[in-house]
Amino acid sequence: MGQNDLVKTLRMNYLFDFYQSLLTNKQRNYLELFYLEDYSLSEIADTFNVSRQAVYDNIRRTGDLVEDYEKKLELYQKFEQRREIYDEMKKHLSNPEQIQRYIQQLEDLE
């Protein structure tokens, strides 16, 4: 698996965590098996007795759908921003003024 594939898989895992409740059972099952369980398209197709192409199309469409949810809701983006702020806060625990600025940044994200 290349670096870009790994980054995409990691992103899809996060998007799946945030948006899985908005997906149908079928969409949820396919994404979970493909991205979380590392099943191949053929293995998923065999599991659900459908064609490999049907699985591919469903995963691609569902991936596009969760990306669209992310564009509108920005849950993953805000999660990443909060995580970066928390990391910076840990570095400045002895500086109350800086901590207060980070707290304001966190409040602004909400």
Curated annotation (Swiss-Prot):
Gene3D superfamilies: Winged helix-like DNA-binding domain superfamily/Winged helix DNA-binding domain. It comes from the Bacteria. Coiled coil: none annotated. It holds the Pfam family UPF0122. HAMAP family: UPF0122. Might take part in the signal recognition particle (SRP) pathway. This is inferred from the conservation of its genetic proximity to ftsY/ffh. May be a regulatory protein. Belongs to the UPF0122 family. This is UPF0122 protein SAR1212. It comes from Staphylococcus aureus (strain MRSA252).
